[in-house]
């Protein structure tokens, strides 16, 4: 009835569905626990002892304590809470399952404690390791690389609430051939991503879009404006690229994770006092609050962008377990709103979307993911042609430039 190619794809369908659903459930459970813990640490606990949650004492104390606790987990847990996200790429080969409890605990405490990183890197690591460990027993004919691809696709679908991001990302890595077309290779990852996104949507829907005025029609001057905005965002991101490996090396000369993360948490607390509560946490909810605020001006947006960028570098350099994509989106949104406030003739839809495109491109060096994030934050079909054009000079600027990553150090 079915062609052998179709039967091969169908055989991978069941593992892909299972992995997609499981990847989403791991994400949902982790985010729910972190959210409950965050409410306790930042609302109930300070209220019960009569301290404002946004007081300098509470912000500095909470982030310093968060750093110390995460440092203790990394030092004493089996596997040292997994790989350092500042060194490893977002998608990598499976780690030992023994490292996963410590990694999950470090992630939850970091998210709840206000660290300026997202969940994407640790969740990706956890899901890939679980898929490889359990999948190889249930379906031994499927290789570790295939489990890695399915788990990462399912996680991407769950994180962003849509399989589109996974389709875009894997379309450039799973290239077809004369024997196996690209869509044959994409079939199982796309099914895993669809299962992950649908499972996530049953519980909550990631809300990325901002209330920004509709962009009506593309003009030549808008292309130039968008390219300039993207270049400014890339320049800001390259400052972080220069700082991260140097700061990472400096901090890790201390050798002791408790001391490193305690110092990192203290610095994050100082930055949190300067930037306020909006610069804490992973950045998605805070981005919505920033966009809906009627009181922030150009100077406030600039402060938020600079502080959040500094917090991202400090958190990554210290070794906190978290990802850099969600904070980069916040930074891009703040930078875009600041540029629009300075030059109101340039539509906010252009400044925000192009700034996000530039920042995410620096962080991920993935053109499809950068376009996707810019398009979902400012969901306007009239912007898509402009963003595709602006991507070209942005990609040229970053060609051959170093990545936002630290170097490995000898123990």
From Swiss-Prot:
GO terms for cellular component: plasma membrane. The keyword Transit peptide does not apply. It is found in: Cell membrane. Keywords: Cell membrane, Ion channel, Ion transport, Membrane, Transmembrane, Transmembrane helix, Transport. The chain crosses the membrane at residues 9-31, 57-74, 95-117, 148-170, 186-208, 223-245, 258-280, 295-317, 322-341, 345-363, 376-398. It is a multi-pass membrane protein. Pfam families: Voltage_CLC (PF00654). SUPFAM superfamilies: Clc chloride channel. InterPro entries: Chloride_channel_YfeO, Cl-channel_core, ClC, ClC-type_chloride_channel. Gene3D superfamilies: Clc chloride channel (1.10.3080.10). It comes from the Bacteria. GO terms for molecular function: chloride transmembrane transporter activity; monoatomic ion channel activity. Its main location: membrane. Belongs to the chloride channel (TC 2.A.49) family. This is Putative ion-transport protein YfeO.
